[in-house]
Amino acid sequence: MNQTDTSPIRLRRSWNTSEIEALFDEHAGRIDPRIYTDEDLYQLELERVFARSWLLLGHETQIRKPGDYITTYMGEDPVVVVRQKDASIAVFLNQCRHRGMRICRADAGNAKAFTCSYHGWAYDTAGNLVNVPYEAESFACLNKKEWSPLKARVETYKGLIFANWDENAVDLDTYLGEAKFYMDHMLDRTEAGTEAIPGVQKWVIPCNWKFAAEQFCSDMYHAGTTSHLSGILAGLPEDLEMADLAPPTVGKQYRASWGGHGSGFYVGDPNLMLAIMGPKVTSYWTEGPASEKAAERLGSVERGSKLMVEHMTVFPTCSFLPGINTVRTWHPRGPNEVEVWAFTVVDADAPDDIKEEFRRQTLRTFSAGGVFEQDDGENWVEIQHILRGHKARSRPFNAEMSMDQTVDNDPVYPGRISNNVYSEEAARGLYAHWLRMMTSPDWDALKATR
């Protein structure tokens, strides 16, 4: 692998609205590669995308008891996520108001309070400033109520925790919209819901966050060609040969009517899932009591047991693979780097051996050292490396696949649906919403585009 210089490419001081609008042409299917490299665009993303979107922070079962906490990020802003005594969840900026040091330096734990290690300012688990050393002697006029860290809005959807800095943003339910229908394929297969397998894997990829978000949103194309041949070969059951594993062709792709979310899935053919997750997980997902229960809850046998190798992104950076059950956030680290935080969910009432098999197979396939994850990372890193070149950034990328092949009135699947699983309709939706957020000054303007 070529070594990638992750220093930003600074080409200009600012972008005006018309220049940003020209970066993506949905009707022609053209993407300006500068959206993946420009530092000024990235700084605007932090302000207009990451500070105004609902961002995935974790799973409720990672903070079960009062005082349980995890630390994570919203964009590049560090945050603390804490279970409260009343079972609610608080999220606040992990930054002391005195000189800006982290309030909490651990990844996870249980606490009754958080104390800044620099000067000792202390905060309760809701993020309120409660103690200042030498307050009487040195801070006689300090009003502690005015010096708490910034607090985010928090909402959950079927176990997943989301937060948003913007008070004027739509609520999470509205933000997700019909995407909830597709999220339920993983999150609502049983009345017990899901639980997170302990542990979060974290690794850095020197590429722009949008490459990862787009692939999980829209790109079944690479899975049906040559990208993952080595991983498929490694995971084939003994009674299957590569010749028996023709790439599936039957499936659908979903594009959110508004919001940038997207998903895609094969229908009916289990062979690729067998190669990825093995016979035990595939059988659990497609036949027997668990799949029958899922079919009943989800309203159809197809949704409960026939959807294979599904991929999904909730805009901008929440991605997961139902059936494989990896869930991850793509934390941006500049225009040329992303930090991946991934965990695995399972049906809470699944047998222990099934939970263990999900854990084992996800580690083998989609983890920092996973055989499929390595293929994806290699491609993204090499693309980012090539985009260091002036000429490489000067010619648009093609996003025309399956253009004009969507319907808005599918009898089963909501949103804009492509009946060709090999489509870039969801990618066009992701970039259209990215453009919408980058050119809208506030949520009032965004709401007007719905």
Swiss-Prot record:
Pathway: Aromatic compound metabolism; benzene degradation; catechol from benzene: step 1/2; Xenobiotic degradation; toluene degradation; Xenobiotic degradation; xylene degradation. It catalyses: benzene + NADH + O2 + H(+) = cis-1,2-dihydrobenzene-1,2-diol + NAD(+); toluene + NADH + O2 + H(+) = (1S,2R)-3-methylcyclohexa-3,5-diene-1,2-diol + NAD(+). Binds 1 [2Fe-2S] cluster per subunit. Binds 1 Fe cation per subunit. It is an enzyme of class 1 (oxidoreductase). Gene3D superfamilies: Naphthalene 1,2-dioxygenase Alpha Subunit, Chain A, domain 1, Rieske [2Fe-2S] iron-sulphur domain. It comes from the Bacteria. Pfam families: Rieske, Ring_hydroxyl_A. SUPFAM superfamilies: Bet v1-like, ISP domain. This dioxygenase system consists of four proteins: the two subunits of the hydroxylase component (BnzA and BnzB), a ferredoxin (BnzC) and a ferredoxin reductase (BnzD). This is Benzene 1,2-dioxygenase subunit alpha. The lineage of its organism: Bacteria, Pseudomonadati, Pseudomonadota, Gammaproteobacteria, Pseudomonadales. The gene is bnzA.
